[in-house]
Amino acid sequence: MEVFEEVRDVVVEQLSVAPDAVKIDSKIIEDLGADSLDVVELVMALEEKFGIEIPDSEAEKLISIKDVVTYIENLNKNK
């Protein structure tokens, strides 16, 4: 499964949005309707799913789904 698909599954579960609503260029807050608490919970769910740690300073930069996918792919490359 691609990283995007795994991220999409987590986003769908955490934000209760339809899978079709989650596109690579979707903005987490603007397009998917997340609030700040949703974002914190989403980051925690992503950390658990991928076995990673996302520092707050990095989490603030994750605006779109593409940002999340790129961040996770880069972490996986550096393992």
Curated annotation (Swiss-Prot):
InterPro entries: ACP, ACP-like_sf, PKS_PP-bd, PP-bd_ACP, Ppantetheine_attach_site. PROSITE patterns: CARRIER, PHOSPHOPANTETHEINE. It comes from the Bacteria. Keywords: Cytoplasm, Fatty acid biosynthesis, Fatty acid metabolism, Lipid biosynthesis, Lipid metabolism, Phosphopantetheine, Phosphoprotein. GO terms for biological process: lipid A biosynthetic process. The modification O-(pantetheine 4'-phosphoryl)serine is found at S36. Pathway: Lipid metabolism; fatty acid biosynthesis. 4'-phosphopantetheine is transferred from CoA to a specific serine of apo-ACP by AcpS. This modification is essential for activity because fatty acids are bound in thioester linkage to the sulfhydryl of the prosthetic group. GO terms for molecular function: acyl binding; acyl carrier activity; phosphopantetheine binding. GO terms for cellular component: cytosol; membrane. Its main location: cytoplasm. Residues 1-76 form the Carrier domain. It is found in: Cytoplasm. Belongs to the acyl carrier protein (ACP) family. Carrier of the growing fatty acid chain in fatty acid biosynthesis. This is Acyl carrier protein. It comes from Campylobacter hominis (strain ATCC BAA-381 / DSM 21671 / CCUG 45161 / LMG 19568 / NCTC 13146 / CH001A).
